[in-house]
Amino acid sequence: MSTPEEYTGKKNKDEMPDPVGWDAIDAAFDKMYPGQDNPIHFGTLIPWRLGGPDPLQGVSAYDGGDYFHLVTYGLSDLYEKEGGDPEYSGYGLEFTLKLRKAGYEDEMSELKCIASIFNDVARLTFENGEQFYPDEYIYTGQELGFDRQQKSKLTGFITALDEAGTIDTPNGKVDFVKLIGATDAELKAIMEGKLRVRELAEKIGDLTDYTRESVI
């Protein structure tokens, strides 16, 4: 995020009335990570609707032991229902990513980097209407890794349904779409029809691991 505000409490949501969508996301992750009532959180100072640069209203990072489990806030309706789809909330999804605690020294810097990537991808939805679903790939065309130091071999993503699944909120359903880091060679194999997304997911697992080598 371009101007992240770091805090442990979720201040932004408390400034708005009835954050029913936000609370539903919290509840889903609180269930998976009990006792983490105040995870690391990055919020935006100026909301998108008021001219801010970042479409997401926040990103939280839960501690999973050997990984961080990040989740976005803002692709779904966090407060009142605004989207026109009677079944789904907002765009119908939030992004997640499980970042292994390896291959970097500054954890906060890497978490900020993932938050920035989330915003870059979400911007495609907000500006172009592009939707993202499980079992797809995101090819960036870049040659350097997307980690802060650009030392990893991960340049893009495949997607899968997060273990948080799909939740029902007062504003409609929300799918948690997990981004999983993939190498350029792996993504090209998918694009060329040599490998399916699910096949790659079975090979690499669901953690984004900056230290791993390409399986292709």
Regions found by a protein language model. Name each.
Residues 1-82, 86-91, 95-216:
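Acidic, proline/glycine-rich low-complexity IDRs
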